[in-house]
Amino acid sequence: MFKKALFILSLCPSFVVAQSYVVYDFTHNRVLESHAPDSVQPIASVTKLMTANVFLENNRNANCTASITDDDYDYIKGTHTKLPKYTPISCNELLKAMLVHSDNYAAHALSRSAGMSRLQFIQKMNEKARELGMRSTRFSDSSGLSDSNISSAMDLVKLAKYSLNKAQIKNLSNMPSAFIQAGGRSVFVKNTNKLVREEVFDAAIN
């Protein structure tokens, strides 16, 4: 993926419209190309990468379940989920829905399913950011809906590199589509990343 991305950038630099970006070689630990790499911006659903890490590292119940509640609907107004409400769903299925389909409700359900409150979970996300040296990063929710979730491209390189150690994150985030088992139903979802959905790239992590 990284070779292809660099090739595109070198041939067509005018196609790059991001306010900031980093092309990073994880094999040799070096920046290949960047623009405003330390600029702090809202990171939206990239937040879910940290949510996945914190959940996997803190959940001690392999059989845990969680339900989408009215509180989730009140917080995430204006967004949609295919997952049923008030239905116990396996945390593994919620993780799949979050990483494949970027489901905001799944992210919020997971944030109170690892043996702590939602606020404690957000605190763990910020602690992990500091541990990884992500000095420009702050989290205020687990889905990325809040504009208060901020980071820089260079900080996100650190998060991506750390996430490479978790096969579950790598495998789920790169599935073009998936079936989520919820309340006796199989809910079909597609990856929200078109490049992954159409299998344009063989990504290290998405």
What label would you give each PLM region?
Residues 135, 147-151, 155-206:
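Domain-terminus/edge residues, biased toward the C-terminal soluble/receptor-binding domains
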Residues 16-167:
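Active-site-adjacent loops and short helices of periplasmic peptidoglycan-processing enzymes
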Residues 2-13:
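Sec-dependent N-terminal signal peptides
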Residues 2, 124-127, 192:
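Non-catalytic cell-wall polysaccharide-engagement segments
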Residues 10-11, 51-55, 181-182, 191-192:
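Intrinsically disordered, low-complexity boundary segments flanking structured domains
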